[in-house]
C-alpha cells in the first residue's frame, strides 16, 4: 500500500500545472484531500545585510505567493526558481548572497539564519493537497468524484460535457482545462463533483 501527497491548487497562485499533468499521464487514484495553511520564511545559510542580497531562490509557487512582499522589500534581488524549497535552502549554502524562501521546518533543519517570518502576500494563504495512491479506498458520505474528460476543441464541446450533470442536478465544485499533450485539437477537462463515483447518477455520467 503506497500513498503520496501532492499540491493541486493554491488560494493565491491557482492550479499547480505539474500535478494536473501527472494526473493525466499516470494511472493513479485520488484517495482524499486536505487543505493546509502555508507560511513562508525568508532565510539564508550565512547572515548578511538584506540590502546586499543578489538572489532569492525558491519553488515558483512560493516565489509567486510572496511576490508583493519581495517587490516591496527586495526589488533589486534576482529571483531564481528551484525544484523545491529544500533545493532553495541548499542553493543558499552553495551560492553567496542568496536568500531562500522556505518553511519553518527547513529553517530549523538546515540551520538557516531567519530574517523574516510569514512573508506570504495573503494571510489566508492555503493549498489544497491530494492524497494519491494505487488502491481504492472505502467510500464515505463525504466523498467526491474527480473526472478527467478529453474532448475535441470544437464549439459546444464543453456544453455537451456539462449538460448531463445539470440535467441530474450534480454539483460541480471545480473545472480546470488544460491543452492535451496528445493532440493539438483536444483539451483535457479536470472536474470535481460532489457526487459519489458509484451512485447511479455518477455512473451514468461516466458512461455517457
Identify the residue ranges that each predicted region occupies:
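Single conserved hydrophobic/aromatic residue that forms the stacking wall/gate
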Residues: 198-208
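Domain-level signature for soluble enzymes in the chorismate/prephenate branch of the shikimate pathway
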Residues: 1-200
Amino acid at each position: 500500500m503506497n500513498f503520496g501527497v501532492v499540491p493541486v491548487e493554491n488560494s493565491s497562485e491557482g492550479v499547480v500545472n505539474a500535478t494536473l499533468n501527472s494526473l493525466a499521464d499516470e494511472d493513479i487514484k485520488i484517495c482524499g484531500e486536505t487543505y493546509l495553511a502555508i507560511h513562508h520564511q525568508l532565510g539564508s545559510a550565512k547572515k548578511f545585510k538584506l540590502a546586499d542580497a543578489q538572489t532569492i531562490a525558491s519553488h515558483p509557487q512560493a516565489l509567486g505567493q510572496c511576490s508583493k512582499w519581495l517587490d516591496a522589500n527586495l526589488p533589486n534581488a534576482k529571483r531564481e526558481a528551484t525544484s523545491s524549497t529544500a533545493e532553495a535552502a541548499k542553493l543558499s549554502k552553495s551560492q553567496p548572497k542568496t536568500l531562500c524562501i522556505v518553511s519553518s521546518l527547513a529553517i530549523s533543519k538546515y540551520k538557516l539564519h531567519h530574517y523574516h517570518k510569514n512573508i506570504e502576500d495573503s494571510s489566508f494563504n492555503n493549498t489544497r493537497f491530494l492524497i494519491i495512491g494505487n488502491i481504492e479506498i472505502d467510500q464515505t458520505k463525504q466523498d467526491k468524484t474527480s473526472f478527467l474528460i478529453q474532448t475535441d476543441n470544437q464549439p459546444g464541446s464543453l456544453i455537451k460535457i456539462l449538460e448531463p450533470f445539470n440535467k441530474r442536478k450534480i454539483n460541480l465544485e471545480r473545472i480546470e482545462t488544460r491543452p492535451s499533450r496528445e493532440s493539438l485539437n483536444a483539451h483535457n477537462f479536470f472536474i470535481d463533483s460532489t457526487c459519489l463515483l458509484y451512485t447511479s447518477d455518477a455512473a451514468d455520467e461516466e458512461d455517457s
